[in-house]
Amino acid sequence: ENVDYCESLAAKEYFSYYHEGFNRRSEDPINSRLNYGYAVVRSAIARKLVATGFHPTFGIHHDNQLNAFNLADDLIEPYRAIVDLVAHNNIASNIQLTKSERRELAHVLHNACIGDGVKVNVMSAIDIMVESLKRIILDASTEKLKLPMILPIESMEGITE
């Protein structure tokens, strides 16, 4: 069965729970928040990939020649849920995000999750995941990729912005 087709069917089903008639490409306040939050996490993953020596264009599953971030798109999936949780807080009625909303969504990188069995922020979980991918590839390891476990929305202590 075509993996892309399965992924698109799953996404369609998932997004149908947002509200009736929701389309992930529609222009509405929820979608604006989701897109911004996903972009924040995607760019953090891409930065870590480059810093670790990966070329983010070369993906494992994603392989669009016009996409410079295929590998980041492969790795973002487990982080979408945390963006979804944050994006559904205080939804405004305007498509255009305010500075405050953008700050709140960028703060997703400081939310708590479990990375390698320890409570860490999303940025640290991204570091753990990418470093584990590097070890798997370089050592031809059978180790599993260290993915985050999502927690309810909670900011790590000591981070105010």
Q: Which positions does each model-derived feature cover?
A:
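Active-site helix-to-loop segments that bind/position phosphate- or nucleotide-bearing substrates
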Residues: 1-161
